[in-house]
Amino acid sequence: MGAMTARARTFAAALTSVLAVTACSSTTQPTPVTSDSVPTLTTEVVREYDRGKDAFTQGFEIDGDVLYEGTGLEGSSFVRRTSLDTMTELDRVDLPSDLFGEGITVDGDTLWQITWQDGVAIARDRDTLAEQRRVNYDGEGWGLCTQASADRLVMSDGSSTLTFRDPTSFDAEGTVNVTLDGNPVERLNELECADDGSVYANVWQTFDIMRIDPETGAVTAVIDGTPLWNSMSASQRGGADVFNGIAQIPGTDRFLVTGKYWPTIFEVRFTDTAPVGQN
């Protein structure tokens, strides 16, 4: 996209949100992606956590016993720390009203937070969320995660491309194009760098999560999150936006997943068979 004024960006974001909510609330849901070459997995719900509908979730990550979350929309963006044990908010910092927050990730003592079309990455203290410095980058910012084994950050920009960045300078160090059956997978959104080296990515305006080999860009599994949306009541779905937010619980095979303005965080496993009672 070309340059936009703050008012135009806010209007575009609001319109996008309305369209996304309409799409998700429609009786015609997005059709899950399928492939003959990679497995389609589903979600086994282990536990559900209730929360308010105040979070336009853009970044979602667990470090130790803390859940970090970054949210979006100009004038409403914030980043917060939440206790993983009690799901109570520990700290919260609002972004300046002209910034549209996007993905977040923790690397060492630093929490990185990117922005949508502002070209600004903010380095924060992991424990206090205090801003330490800012770095400029080109293009849009959508999702972000830390691949510690490779000493790099992985960033999405809404296309099929993942960009690798230096965790200290935030300089771009390379890219990979994400493909499924040889075709590019566009609209990659929130990211999670998992313990096994895979990168998980929400696909915007769908209930799909792609499991990606970051070395080749090949999708190795497609996860269908539709049952999570279907499990919520009509009142829970009211005002809820798109599926977005993946955070692995360290050292386990479980993940926390949610969506923008979703009132529920789901603790799930990704399995190849739907548990009895889920559809």
What are these regions (language model features)?
Residues 47-50, 90, 94-97, 175-184, ...:
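Surface-exposed loop and turn segments in beta-propeller and other repeat-based domains
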Residues 68-74, 111-118, 153-159, 201-205, ...:
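Conserved beta-strand positions in repeat-built beta-propeller and related beta-rich domains
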Residues 82-87, 125-129, 167-170, 213-217, ...:
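Short loop/turn segments that connect beta-strands within beta-propeller blades
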Residues 53-64, 97-108, 137-152, 182-197, ...:
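Beta-rich, blade/repeat-based domains predominating
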Residues 33-54, 84-90, 235:
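A short helix->beta-strand "capping" segment at the edge of beta-propeller domains
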Residues 20-23:
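C-terminal motif of bacterial Sec signal peptides marking the signal peptidase cleavage site
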